[in-house]
Amino acid sequence: MAAAAGDGGAKPLQSAMKLANKAIELDTGNRPREAYVEYLRSIHYISQVLLEDVENTTEAGETVPPETSKMLKLAEQCLERAQSTATKLGRICLKPAVPAAPPTPLPTSRHRRVCSDEGGKLSPFLPPEIFQKLQVAESQNSKKELTPLEKASLQNQKLRATYEARMARLDPSQAMQKTSLTLSLQRQMMENLVIAKAREETLQRKMEERRLRLQEAANRRFCSQVALTPEEREQRALYAAILEYEQDHDWPKHWRAKLKRSPGDLSLVTSLLSHLLSLPDHPISQLLKKLQCAVYSALYPIVSRAATSAAPAPGSCSLPPEANGLLAPGSRRLRSSQSLYCMLSPSEPSAAPRVLDGPPPTPSVPTLHSGPLDREADGSPAGPSSPLVDALSHLPDKDSSFEDLEQFLAMSEPQTPGAKREPLLECLKSTVKDIHNAIDRLLSLTLLAFESLNTATSKDRCLACIEEPFFSPLWPLLLALYRSVHRTREAAVSRSMELYRNAPPTALGIPTKLLPRVPEAQASTYPYCTAAQELGLLVLESCPQKKLECIVRTLRVICICAEDYCRAQEARPEGESQPPAAAIGADDLLPILSFVVLRSGLPQLVSECAALEEFTHEGYLIGEEGYCLTSLQSALSYVELLSRGRLDK
């Protein structure tokens, strides 16, 4: 059926996502043993499906489908979660060996983990000193050329081993030969040390001369000023280190030649940055590790204090059951990134439906009457009024649009935030500023090393290549801080998801023409199920750019499903050759997206979007990605408002 075209293409992926989501729910409910079993079951299912696909493949050169990479990514994240859960279970098993404690503090120790389980990392997080050791381990394991003295020491060890072997073969009566061998060994060892010392002194002198020469080149590259800021001095020293590195390696010259031959090839830029950041001894890679450790060390105590000071309810992932102030100040408006090197990249052709073009709309939601709801599209019989209608009927009499709902919600939030939120907000602002500055430093140093990358499109690609390795180990901890700041908002969204999980699509204002003709199975699938599954993949990523791409794909899947449903509805009259209506309008997009958000069961999307809003630069915010992010934020605000209306009842 055409209506199911958007929902039937990724059944194994959907099943794997359901297993993973079940495991996540068990883990957030503080049931680590059951969660551990579900994580292993998810991994086993994915492995079995992929193995069957490979065994059924007849052609050796057949390409791997896109679903395979997604399932491998999901399996990787489940494996990391299972490992963290196993570690947690090990600590729980060791607790009985500790001297008995009063029964009252036990619940507190059970809820000491930080509320952040996205990106494949489970809390508690690693201490900063261990994180730093892991980050610098690769640099220490890299091959290092031996100095002349070290080479001489190895030669002397071999000479001594040979001497001892020959001495063991001599008879006790051959004292003269033993004395000769001893004197010969001492002479050779002394000669090796003298020659090595002379070579090392010469090498050090040449290295110092080269360092001074490269330092002069770095000074000429920068504006010679009498008083330099510490940042400028550090940048100049790093540039001199890059010049010194390139004296011993030829690959930068080869890459510059490739970029000169193909200046507009962005794939070369991606390959260059991937190769550069994979070398732990390159100054840019070392700076990235250093900045990562600095940000992690600043985040860890903040998140730890926020986790221990919170008073979580059992099974709620540290979210309070009630929400007094549902919105953090300034959390809905798109802000410009603070990056100095974020340039507007030319818009690339997109295959997105027409609904994704143009400025963000202010769609209206049809008025929900207090009578029986139309449940035909969802396959359930007509019955008494839904709680969704009761909640919305108690809202003030306003124009029923998402923009007005958002404005009403903004007016209802308290004017003075709680005392506990102010320090967290200040810490968050400071951390965000540090991250922007760190990325700016990495980007500027990369552009200094490879001047041919100093174009708008190449800068954007460099920024994307730098952000992925930079954010990957930091995102779980950074998201935990965002979730602490937006705790009340997530609580409201979570409550709405629990209250209206089974609400029919028509209750949110979705017209029947954009729903399947035949009701879909309630247990396994529902309208726009594929879009909800795609949105669920967002929490598995740890890079802002990939998370943004996931949001764009979600809206595209919504448009595809809506067009399929609409085409199936309009295909009823026989002999009608008129093409179906155009893509769905903005008035229909946000109600559908709100329904998808409700069905996703992911209240942490509030914090994810707040972080994406901050770390997405202008080139994307004014394009399709920014439109999709704004639409998702509007849908989240509407879902949050549903809980507000219910609580006001």
Curated annotation (Swiss-Prot):
Keywords: Phosphoprotein. GO terms for molecular function: guanyl-nucleotide exchange factor activity. It comes from the Eukaryota. Residues 348-393 are annotated as: Disordered. Residues 487-648 form the VPS9 domain. Transmembrane segments: none annotated. The modification Phosphoserine is found at S116. The keyword Phosphoprotein applies. One of its GO terms (biological process) is vesicle-mediated transport. This is VPS9 domain-containing protein 1. It comes from Mus musculus (Mouse).
